[in-house]
Design a protein with these regions (language model features):
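A conserved beta-strand element that flanks and buttresses the S-adenosyl-L-methionine
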Residues: 165
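Hydrophobic adenine-recognition pocket in adenosine-nucleotide-binding enzymes
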Residues: 169
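Class I (Rossmann-like) S-adenosyl-L-methionine-dependent methyltransferase catalytic domain
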Residues: 2-155, 159, 173-184, 193-258
């Protein structure tokens, strides 16, 4: 792993776009279609990851105080929401979510399907999506679409999504494609919809990983790119209780700038 200077806007390896994305695709073709494969040998952190993600996401959703998460949202009784958290401007009815960089569906199965009626999955590796159909079990019936496509090319259906969840995948996008992707995502949001990002962050600058053709950006750099994408961060939170040797992980909730 090479540390790129903060002044370097585009690491050299990212300048050949075709090779950059091709190398990443080749890397993931050789990764086992398992939770351990998706998490780089850290399958044991999955419950902790999901727990904090769920707590973060539920703060934005119209849900009863004690909901049966196995029951699709459309048949739950929704109580009027009330909150003193001024960072949450409105609650979202959890209808359809999009899981970006979905892999075999770990986040879809454990975070999104328990909260939403329907989930769409977008993942560049078709083999992972095929495995997802087994991994999800009966829950696969609530998958709206399986999109086998890289985020650099993906165009969400206009106005479809209550929430777009993007986790541990943005490092594969060049800065320009990062901005373009989030501009398209905004068109995919239903009225009042939300974009959530969960990513590793560096203390400063950009870390380059030539093995899997990815970068890890700083909080400052991510916010710079969010701003270029015309997104406003309305809430952020640091993931707790991960092993010390891992990157710091941060969650961001965003809405389009008004």
């Amino acid at each position: 792993m090479i540390m790129a200077s903060a002044e370097s806007d585009i690491p050299t390896e990212m300048q050949d776009r075709g090779k950059w994305y091709g190398d990443a695709a080749d890397y993931w073709k050789n990764i086992p279609a398992t939770v351990n494969g998706m998490l780089g040998g850290y399958a044991h952190i999955s419950p902790t990851d999901i727990k904090d993600s769920k707590q973060f996401l539920k703060s934005f959703l119209e849900l009863p105080d004690e909901c049966d998460e196995k029951t699709p949202a459309k048949v739950r009784r929704i109580e009027p929401s009330s909150t003193n958290d001024t960072s949450i401007t409105s609650k979202i009815k959890p209808s359809i979510a999009l899981d970006c960089g979905a892999g075999i569906g770990r986040v879809t199965k454990n975070l999104l399907l328990p909260l939403f009626d329907t989930v769409d999955m977008v993942e560049q590796n078709p083999a992972f999506l095929q495995k997802a159909k087994d991994y999800l079990g009966e829950k696969k019936d609530r998958i709206g679409h399986f999109y086998a496509q890289g985020l650099q090319d993906f165009k969400p259906e206009t106005g479809r999504y209550s929430v777009i969840w993007v986790q541990w995948v943005l490092g594969h996008l060049t800065d320009d494609d990062f901005v373009d992707f989030f501009e398209r995502c905004q068109l995919g949001l239903a009225p009042g919809g939300l974009i959530c990002v969960k990513e590793n962050i560096t203390k400063t600058g950009v870390d380059m990983d030539s093995e899997d053709s990815s970068v890890t950006r700083s909080d400052e750099k991510l916010r710079e790119l969010f701003a270029k994408s015309s997104l406003t961060v309305i809430k952020d939170e640091v993931q707790k209780n991960f092993p010390g040797e891992l990157y710091r992980v941060k969650m961001y909730a965003m809405r389009p700038k008004s």
